[in-house]
């Protein structure tokens, strides 16, 4: 029996603020690239996902029964509903850039049943410039978060697909070969291919796939050696053009190629990429080109995108990379006979959109605040990291603290 992980995630204030800050930085970067934020429904018809091939496994979806008897699912994916909505509107005549930050829900034996993703979808443009744009956006977002070191591994499904067609393998043989190539198990791959009825030249080309990784220029040269038709040549040309654009953008230091990156081949139709850091053995972002997904909604439109795994990013954020987490902008403490003045000061600060906590001086509560104001019968004493001074009135106090900020 499989025990799925349904742990509740309660985000306490410091964790919530840390996550909110990461999301805000990512959303700000998405905005600077021209991506407009959208949202998809939390509940969707089960049929929409079950009828789309090569995407979400049916057993992974969290299903619920509507009072009408319809089977619904909690959102297991964002790209599919965005693609459907785009196809069903009149927006398909022009390029469209969307961004999102949403929770997705899937059964998983080892992870929580839901997680947060932030990503983008770029519809209508099949050019290498579009591929390079979303990769550059991913890189800039990671740089904003001061996550280092990291690498974006870029692959392409085209060459491997062409070799598979020539090999004419069964579904089971393809699955076995996929697993061996993705794990870069060279010896087992060779042994497995030896037992198949394929010619020696094709076998050698397939064996090269897991070794085509590393420096992009080197990988492109080595990939050229196994090109046998125009389709494969177009793949190499696409990789060359995308890398040239990334070099023009002066971000090639973050790029490596991996033509053994062949996951979700039924979903991705071209460029595939993943983001990795040394600290985590799993991708912190995944993306690629999925030009054929929209055809399952009866209108084929080129598209490329990616999504960050926010919860994985949070494990990489160090305290020094985040703003100081405090419980309040101002802590107002007051003597018993000065409560009215303290309440008035708190109200004025809150009207200026400041976060304020107020308590009597004898309170034992320990509050972390950027500024402390002690209100007694004759003065307002301000204590902050860079100043300690006394004012004679509320107006004088407000004039100083609000002007300063």
Curated annotation (Swiss-Prot):
**CDD domains attached to this UniProt entry:** HisRS-like_core
Q: Which GO terms describe its biological process?
A: histidyl-tRNA aminoacylation; L-histidine biosynthetic process
Q: Name one GO cellular component term.
A: cytoplasm
The protein's location, in the record's own words, is:
Cytoplasm
Does the entry feature the keyword Cytoplasm, yes or no?
yes
Give the record's keywords alphabetically.
Amino-acid biosynthesis, Cytoplasm, Histidine biosynthesis
Q: Name the pathway it acts in.
A: Amino-acid biosynthesis; L-histidine biosynthesis; L-histidine from 5-phospho-alpha-D-ribose 1-diphosphate: step 1/9
Principal location: cytoplasm
- Which Gene Ontology MF annotations are present? catalytic activity, acting on a protein; histidine-tRNA ligase activity; transferase activity
Which PANTHER family does the entry mention? Answer: ATP PHOSPHORIBOSYLTRANSFERASE REGULATORY SUBUNIT, HISTIDYL-TRNA SYNTHETASE
Protein family according to the UniProt entry: Belongs to the class-II aminoacyl-tRNA synthetase family. HisZ subfamily.
State what this protein does: Required for the first step of histidine biosynthesis. May allow the feedback regulation of ATP phosphoribosyltransferase activity by histidine.
Also noted in the record is: This function is generally fulfilled by the C-terminal part of HisG, which is missing in some bacteria such as this one.
Quaternary structure per UniProt?
Heteromultimer composed of HisG and HisZ subunits.
**Protein name as catalogued:** ATP phosphoribosyltransferase regulatory subunit
Organism the protein comes from: Oceanobacillus iheyensis (strain DSM 14371 / CIP 107618 / JCM 11309 / KCTC 3954 / HTE831)
What gene name is listed for this protein? hisZ
């Amino acid at each position: 029996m499989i025990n799925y992980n349904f742990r509740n995630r309660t985000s306490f204030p410091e964790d919530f603020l840390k996550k909110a800050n990461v999301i805000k930085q990512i959303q700000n970067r998405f905005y600077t690239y021209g991506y407009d934020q959208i949202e998809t429904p939390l509940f969707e018809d089960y049929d929409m996902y079950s009828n789309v091939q090569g995407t979400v496994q049916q057993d992974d979806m969290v299903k619920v029964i509507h009072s009408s008897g319809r089977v619904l699912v909690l959102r297991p994916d964002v790209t599919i509903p965005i693609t459907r909505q785009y196809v069903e509107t009149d927006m398909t005549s022009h390029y469209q850039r969307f961004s999102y930050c949403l929770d997705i829900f899937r059964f998983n034996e080892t992870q929580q049943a839901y997680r947060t993703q932030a990503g983008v979808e770029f519809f209508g443009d099949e050019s290498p410039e579009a591929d390079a744009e979303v990769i550059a956006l991913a890189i800039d977002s990671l740089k904003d978060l001061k996550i280092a070191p990291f690498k974006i591994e870029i692959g392409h499904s085209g060459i491997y697909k062409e070799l598979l067609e020539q090999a004419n393998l069964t579904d089971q043989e393809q699955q076995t070969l996929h697993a061996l190539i993705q794990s870069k198990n060279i010896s087992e791959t060779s042994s497995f291919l030896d037992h198949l009825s394929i010619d020696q030249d094709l076998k050698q080309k397939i064996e090269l796939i897991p070794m085509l990784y590393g420096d992009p220029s080197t990988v492109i040269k080595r990939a050229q050696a196994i090109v046998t038709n125009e389709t494969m040549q177009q793949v190499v040309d696409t990789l060359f053009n995308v890398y040239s654009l990334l070099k023009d953008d002066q971000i090639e230091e973050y790029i490596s190629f991996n033509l053994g990156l062949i996951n979700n081949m039924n979903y991705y139709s071209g460029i595939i990429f993943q983001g990795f850091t040394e600290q985590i053995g799993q991708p912190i972002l995944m993306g690629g080109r999925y030009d054929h997904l929209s055809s399952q909604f009866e209108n084929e439109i080129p598209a490329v995108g990616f999504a960050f795994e926010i919860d994985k990013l949070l494990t990489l954020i160090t305290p020094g990379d985040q703003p100081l987490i405090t419980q309040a902008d101002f802590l107002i403490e007051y003597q018993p006979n000065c409560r009215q003045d303290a309440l008035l000061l708190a109200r004025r600060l809150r009207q200026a959109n400041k976060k304020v906590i107020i308590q009597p001086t004898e309170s034992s509560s320990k509050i972390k605040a950027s500024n402390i104001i002690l209100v007694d019968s004759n003065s307002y004493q301000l204590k902050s990291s860079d100043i300690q001074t006394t004012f004679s009135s509320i107006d004088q106090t407000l004039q100083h603290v609000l002007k300063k900020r």
